[in-house]
């Protein structure tokens, strides 16, 4: 098994970011997103709720002008109440607060607790009317916190006690979140303004919700959003372009790996041309049918030499992609049809070898249990049939 590499300095590159392949990647993503790749950002990885939540709460408590929060799951548990209280206090001291939670992933109890604090909150696409039930499959899956238009927190982390091990609680969900500052925050804020308008009809003043940025970082970044409201499949095209640009390695960590045939073929082609393709999935996810479908789905990748590893418990919810230890992508999307086409998602692509190497190391450290073709073939006929049957439901999982 390949020994995980130590994080390299930003001057050492596995992939040549000046190559024609990366120039094509930059041009393609710029064309499909209609957003520039902006320089001078800072992106810092945060590990689990124990690392991320205190920084997020501190940022809310020191906010001076605006706070915007979007979350798919926002539980009304201990950590959820801490966030509700902090947002309520910010609202009381005159900070403009807007909270967008998903109507399916977050409960009415959470919504009521926000209302009790007089926090402006909306449940995204929440309806019990039969003629609007066709929207039930379209979920707001983004996890974003924006403070004063200056800094943002983004990644896979929901707001829930299972993400924290404070006070001797056991972490049951591992995750990787990110603290972002710099000009790319303007893109993140603009997307929230669009989502808020879509959900409520309220137009937020761009001048109030954005701020000038001090150009102090070295990271080039750009947001990619996906959803049924997009004319082009920004996320799928970005992933395909990144796979095509790879010169040495592709590493993926995702809680759910059920890509469509186009992405599967791209990964297979990458492996056949000598690219190291490494995919890390949980040993057990939080949905057994997803595990069954994944077992039926990854055989063709193993056959062409892709490496598939399992992250041991607790359930690893991180969503990371690294190419050549030079380019990386992180955010809310999973590698499944729901994230590519049905959910409203946000990811950030980053051109920075230091951050990419850090995330590459995280992926290597998480993936410690290799999956083999022999193991898949050893499944009983009944299990194989079950897994194959569930795999047919990929568009709906």
Regions found by a protein language model. Give the residues of each.
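N-terminal localization/anchoring segments of enzymes in phospholipid and broader phosphate metabolism
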Residues: 1-236, 241, 245, 285, ...
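Active-site donor-binding acidic/aromatic loop of nucleotide-activated sugar
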Residues: 308-312
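Short, solvent-exposed amphipathic alpha-helical segments in soluble enzyme
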Residues: 266-270, 296, 365
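Catalytic-core elements of nucleic-acid end-processing and repair enzymes
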Residues: 319
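Histidine/acidic-residue-rich catalytic or RNA/ligand-binding cores of hydrolases
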Residues: 261-264, 291-293, 323, 341-343
């Amino acid at each position: 098994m390949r020994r995980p590499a130590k994080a390299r300095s930003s001057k050492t590159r596995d992939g040549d970011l000046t190559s024609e392949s990366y120039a094509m990647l930059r041009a393609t993503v710029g064309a499909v997103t209609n957003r520039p790749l902006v320089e001078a950002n800072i992106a810092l990885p945060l590990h689990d709720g124990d690392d991320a939540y205190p920084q997020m709460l501190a940022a809310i408590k020191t906010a001076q002008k605006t706070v915007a929060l979007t979350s798919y799951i926002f539980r009304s548990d201990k950590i959820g109440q801490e966030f509700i209280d902090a947002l309520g206090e910010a609202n009381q001291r005159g900070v403009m607060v807007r909270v967008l939670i998903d109507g399916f992933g977050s409960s009415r109890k959470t919504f009521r607790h926000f209302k009790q604090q007089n926090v402006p909150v909306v449940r995204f696409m929440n309806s019990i009317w039969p003629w609007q039930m066709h929207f039930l499959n379209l979920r707001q899956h983004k996890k974003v916190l924006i403070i004063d238009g200056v800094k943002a927190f983004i990644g896979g982390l929901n707001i829930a006690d299972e993400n924290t091990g404070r006070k001797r609680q056991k972490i049951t969900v591992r995750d990787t979140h990110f603290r972002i500052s710099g000009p790319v925050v303007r893109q993140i804020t603009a997307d929230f303004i669009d989502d808020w308008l879509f959900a409520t009809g309220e137009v937020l003043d761009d001048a109030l919700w954005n701020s000038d940025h001090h150009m102090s970082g070295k990271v080039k970044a750009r947001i990619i959003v996906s959803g049924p409201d997009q004319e082009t499949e920004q996320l799928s095209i970005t992933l395909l372009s990144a796979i095509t640009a790879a010169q040495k390695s592709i590493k993926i960590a995702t809680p759910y790996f059920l890509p469509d045939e186009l992405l599967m073929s791209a990964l297979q082609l990458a492996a056949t041309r000598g690219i190291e393709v490494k995919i890390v999935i949980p040993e057990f996810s939080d949905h057994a049918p997803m595990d069954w479908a994944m077992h039926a789905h990854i055989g063709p990748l193993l056959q062409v030499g892709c490496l598939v590893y399992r992250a041991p418990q607790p359930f690893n919810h991180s969503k990371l992609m690294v190419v050549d230890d030079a380019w990386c992508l992180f955010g809310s999307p999973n590698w499944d049809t729901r994230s590519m086409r049905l959910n409203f998602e946000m990811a950030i692509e980053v051109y920075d070898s230091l951050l990419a190497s850090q995330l590459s190391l995280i992926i290597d450290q998480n993936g410690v249990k290799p999956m083999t073709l022999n193991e898949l073939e050893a499944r009983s006929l009944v299990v194989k049939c079950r897994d194959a049957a569930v795999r047919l439901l990929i568009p709906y999982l």
